């Protein structure tokens, strides 16, 4: 299972494409269903033993943060920053991941696209924290490791920060992040 994920199966199995197509077609399914659909296609395309399906799906429920993340979040919380997650994930999965990683006391909010029924990079998603907190877009430091998400948040008006852990090349989406960092420790120096 780990070999499959290390070979990029997680990126290959069309999940992002499915979310974007569903958003464009106004045919919403929650992220867990989209994950299942895209994994089912990959199982066929890559001739993977179908009995591995549940094991592969369950890996999403045991994701762990990078080692510096909890301490960085604690530091930001001590500095009185409001911290939130803005994710395509389902509320139940996000809650499960946050609690299982003992991060639930660090976040003020968890925003799921399920609240608006469309996936990022729709501006309706990025608008959720703005509406709830009645703040200006430029007051939000928005971090992501995904260049499409950094571009979406930046295009919306957030101060986008790309977490580029692997020295990747930024996508050509007519947008550049305000900052690029290699891990969350670098964020403390920016705020």
Language model: regions and residue ranges:
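A metal-dependent, Asp-based hydrolase signature
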Residues: 20-54
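Short, contiguous strand/loop micro-motifs
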Residues: 26, 59-60, 81, 113, ...
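Short, acidic loop-to-helix structural element flanking the phosphoryl-transfer center
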Residues: 32-36, 50-85, 95, 123
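Alpha-helical elements of Rossmann-like donor-binding domains used by nucleotide-donor carbohydrate transfer enzymes
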Residues: 10, 37-41, 55, 71, ...
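Single conserved hydrophobic/aromatic residue that forms the stacking wall/gate
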Residues: 1-13
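Glycine-rich active-site loop/strand segments that organize a redox cofactor
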Residues: 16-18
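Asp-based, Mg2+/Mn2+-dependent phosphohydrolase catalytic module
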Residues: 74, 86, 90-91, 95-191
